[in-house]
Amino acid sequence: MNILHSTLSTWRDRLAPVSRTSTFRTTGQITPEEFVLAGDYLVYKFPTWAWADASSPAKRVSYLPPGKQFLVTRGVPCHRRLNENFAGDAGHEDEIVRDMLSGADADDGDGWLRTGGGRDLAEKQAERIKDVRTVDESGNMGEREDDEEDIPDMEDDDDDEEAIIREPAGKSTTQPIRTYNLYITYSNFYRTPRLYLSGYLSPSEPLPPHLMMEDIVGDYKDKTVTLEDFPWFDGGLKMASVHPCRHASVMKTLLDRADAALKIRRDKLKQAHSAAEANRINSERGLEGLVDETRGLSLNEQQGHAAGGDEWEVLQHDEEDQVAIRVDQYLVVFLKFIASVTPGIEHDFTMGV
């Protein structure tokens, strides 16, 4: 059944009519040209990502240029398997999570579905905070910080056999580090990006496909995420793939909320009575802050010229027409959203943001 589904999905993408009309702002979908633009931005801003070609000309799609058939990043670390500490474990109710921009009477469709965790998830947050590590500008993970209260005094415990803390049998959290190659392709049928994942136990030992599901949030397994052949390679290499059927609607919701958050921030800035107050408002980034750090970078020819009074006036004049997320920043936001499906895989390692 999986083979049939994979084959039908591939042919559906290749035979669907190609859209050349941009509906990015109204539908969350992008055209092949916009996918290339967003891919160029991702590669330019985050060099761990690169464009790649199909393994043979017969595997190429006509609506994307040769050499830019898909995007790939390699060797992304995955330090732990998903277990009951992550959302998606069976036996827990689902919960709709809304943000501050949604009213009390908002539709369930306007919120995020926190799968599997339900109310119990809040009780686990304190324990999970201990596993939080920082990411520097280069994308390197920082060391875990020990709780000072848990650090034994070596002078008091010297030669004290009872002071030696031994981990109970079966409770070890040490797990073999896996790595993943991530591939972003364009789905011509859904007109959105699509993510494929290929895992490795070591640089020379591929991870069996069924074991990749250990790194997928439980409620997504075999539903949103399935095992399929990668259409751009010869030989039928099996990968885990995040199905793109809901990508456009989720991205549209993110775009709308980012624009709303940006509008609120602009309104507050207009009412600011001092430079200090304006700086404070600017520091309180909302959803649009996902890409604020990359706002000054663009691959368009209209990139900023030399700084000066004239440029400041132009920015002031055009400010109301700006959007929170541009189409060339699409894949940056897409990867932030897709990370919720595979929280054990360190997606920020590929981006350093």
UniProtKB/Swiss-Prot annotation:
Tell me which UniProt keywords the record has, alphabetically.
Answer: Autophagy, Cytoplasm, Protein transport, Transport, Ubl conjugation pathway
Q: Which domain of life is it from?
A: Eukaryota
The GO biological-process annotations, alphabetized, read as: autophagosome assembly; autophagy of mitochondrion; glycophagy; piecemeal microautophagy of the nucleus; protein targeting to membrane; protein transport
Protein family per UniProt: Belongs to the ATG3 family.
Which GO molecular function annotation, any one, does this entry have? Atg8-family ligase activity
Q: Which residues form the signal peptide?
A: none
Name the segments for region: Flexible region: 85-167
Chain intervals for the UniProt region annotation (Disordered): 135-156
Under Pfam families, the record lists: Autophagy_act_C
According to the record, the residues making up region (Handle region) are 249-329
**Protein name in UniProt:** Autophagy-related protein 3
